[in-house]
Regions:
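N-terminal secretory signal peptides that target proteins for export/translocation
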Residues: 1-6
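Bacterial N-terminal signal peptides
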Residues: 8-18
Length: 127
Protein backbone atom coordinates (compact mmCIF):
# COMPACT_ATOMS: atom_id res chain seq x y z
CA UNK A 1 0.00 0.00 0.00
CA UNK A 2 2.30 2.66 -1.21
CA UNK A 3 1.34 5.85 -2.91
CA UNK A 4 -1.79 8.00 -2.73
CA UNK A 5 -4.27 5.19 -3.48
CA UNK A 6 -2.85 2.92 -0.77
CA UNK A 7 -2.88 5.75 1.75
CA UNK A 8 -6.48 6.66 0.91
CA UNK A 9 -7.55 3.03 1.13
CA UNK A 10 -5.86 2.59 4.51
CA UNK A 11 -7.47 5.80 5.78
CA UNK A 12 -10.90 4.67 4.54
CA UNK A 13 -10.52 1.33 6.34
CA UNK A 14 -9.50 3.03 9.60
CA UNK A 15 -12.46 5.43 9.42
CA UNK A 16 -14.90 2.63 8.60
CA UNK A 17 -13.66 0.58 11.55
CA UNK A 18 -13.95 3.56 13.89
CA UNK A 19 -17.56 4.18 12.90
CA UNK A 20 -18.54 0.51 12.96
CA UNK A 21 -18.41 0.47 16.74
CA UNK A 22 -20.34 3.73 17.05
CA UNK A 23 -23.39 2.80 15.04
CA UNK A 24 -25.22 0.76 17.63
CA UNK A 25 -25.26 1.83 21.23
CA UNK A 26 -27.18 -0.02 23.91
CA UNK A 27 -30.09 2.11 25.00
CA UNK A 28 -30.27 3.17 28.62
CA UNK A 29 -33.35 1.63 30.23
CA UNK A 30 -35.05 3.75 32.87
CA UNK A 31 -36.96 2.18 35.74
CA UNK A 32 -39.57 4.96 36.01
CA UNK A 33 -40.47 5.24 32.33
CA UNK A 34 -39.60 1.80 30.90
CA UNK A 35 -39.83 -0.87 33.61
CA UNK A 36 -42.38 0.42 36.14
CA UNK A 37 -45.22 0.81 33.60
CA UNK A 38 -44.78 -2.85 32.56
CA UNK A 39 -44.80 -4.02 36.18
CA UNK A 40 -47.85 -1.85 36.92
CA UNK A 41 -49.77 -3.25 33.96
CA UNK A 42 -48.80 -6.91 34.24
CA UNK A 43 -47.88 -7.55 37.89
CA UNK A 44 -49.39 -5.02 40.27
CA UNK A 45 -52.87 -6.60 40.29
CA UNK A 46 -51.40 -9.50 42.31
CA UNK A 47 -48.08 -8.23 43.67
CA UNK A 48 -49.12 -5.44 45.98
CA UNK A 49 -49.69 -5.51 49.73
CA UNK A 50 -52.82 -7.50 50.55
CA UNK A 51 -53.17 -9.18 47.16
CA UNK A 52 -52.74 -12.86 46.26
CA UNK A 53 -49.23 -12.70 44.79
CA UNK A 54 -47.99 -10.68 47.72
CA UNK A 55 -49.61 -13.01 50.24
CA UNK A 56 -48.07 -16.07 48.53
CA UNK A 57 -44.54 -14.71 48.10
CA UNK A 58 -44.13 -11.45 49.93
CA UNK A 59 -43.25 -9.69 46.65
CA UNK A 60 -44.64 -6.24 45.99
CA UNK A 61 -43.85 -4.36 42.79
CA UNK A 62 -45.57 -1.18 43.99
CA UNK A 63 -42.23 0.64 44.22
CA UNK A 64 -38.59 0.24 43.27
CA UNK A 65 -37.59 -0.37 46.88
CA UNK A 66 -40.22 -3.08 47.36
CA UNK A 67 -39.23 -4.82 44.11
CA UNK A 68 -35.57 -4.78 45.12
CA UNK A 69 -36.44 -6.16 48.58
CA UNK A 70 -37.73 -9.26 46.81
CA UNK A 71 -39.76 -12.05 48.36
CA UNK A 72 -39.64 -13.67 51.76
CA UNK A 73 -37.54 -16.34 49.98
CA UNK A 74 -34.93 -13.88 48.73
CA UNK A 75 -34.24 -11.25 46.07
CA UNK A 76 -35.85 -11.44 42.63
CA UNK A 77 -33.53 -8.94 40.95
CA UNK A 78 -29.78 -9.44 40.97
CA UNK A 79 -28.39 -6.22 39.47
CA UNK A 80 -26.11 -6.95 36.53
CA UNK A 81 -27.12 -10.63 36.37
CA UNK A 82 -30.32 -11.21 34.37
CA UNK A 83 -29.59 -14.95 33.98
CA UNK A 84 -29.75 -15.48 37.75
CA UNK A 85 -32.52 -12.96 38.47
CA UNK A 86 -35.71 -14.76 39.40
CA UNK A 87 -37.81 -11.95 37.90
CA UNK A 88 -36.23 -12.48 34.48
CA UNK A 89 -36.46 -16.28 34.78
CA UNK A 90 -40.18 -16.04 35.56
CA UNK A 91 -41.14 -13.62 32.79
CA UNK A 92 -39.05 -15.56 30.25
CA UNK A 93 -40.76 -18.82 31.24
CA UNK A 94 -37.50 -20.41 32.44
CA UNK A 95 -38.77 -21.25 35.93
CA UNK A 96 -41.25 -23.86 37.14
CA UNK A 97 -44.28 -23.63 34.77
CA UNK A 98 -46.64 -23.67 37.75
CA UNK A 99 -45.36 -20.24 38.75
CA UNK A 100 -45.24 -18.67 35.27
CA UNK A 101 -45.64 -14.91 35.45
CA UNK A 102 -47.88 -13.17 34.95
CA UNK A 103 -49.87 -15.97 36.58
CA UNK A 104 -53.11 -16.78 34.78
CA UNK A 105 -52.49 -14.09 32.15
CA UNK A 106 -50.78 -13.88 28.81
CA UNK A 107 -47.01 -13.54 28.80
CA UNK A 108 -45.39 -10.15 28.54
CA UNK A 109 -44.62 -8.91 25.05
CA UNK A 110 -41.13 -9.86 23.88
CA UNK A 111 -40.11 -6.20 23.86
CA UNK A 112 -41.19 -5.83 27.49
CA UNK A 113 -39.19 -8.90 28.49
CA UNK A 114 -36.13 -7.57 26.65
CA UNK A 115 -36.53 -4.19 28.36
CA UNK A 116 -36.61 -5.74 31.84
CA UNK A 117 -33.69 -8.03 30.99
CA UNK A 118 -31.64 -5.08 29.71
CA UNK A 119 -32.51 -3.00 32.80
CA UNK A 120 -31.28 -5.81 35.07
CA UNK A 121 -28.11 -6.23 32.97
CA UNK A 122 -27.47 -2.47 33.31
CA UNK A 123 -27.44 -2.86 37.09
CA UNK A 124 -31.18 -2.35 37.77
CA UNK A 125 -30.79 1.33 38.65
CA UNK A 126 -33.54 3.40 40.27
CA UNK A 127 -33.66 5.96 37.48
Amino acid sequence: MHGPIGTKLALAIVIAMAFAGCGRQERQVKFASDVKPVLDRACLDCHEDGKAGYEASGLSVASYDELMTGTRFGPVVLPGDPESSVLVQLIEGRADPSIKMPHGSESLYQGEIETIRLWVSQGAPNN
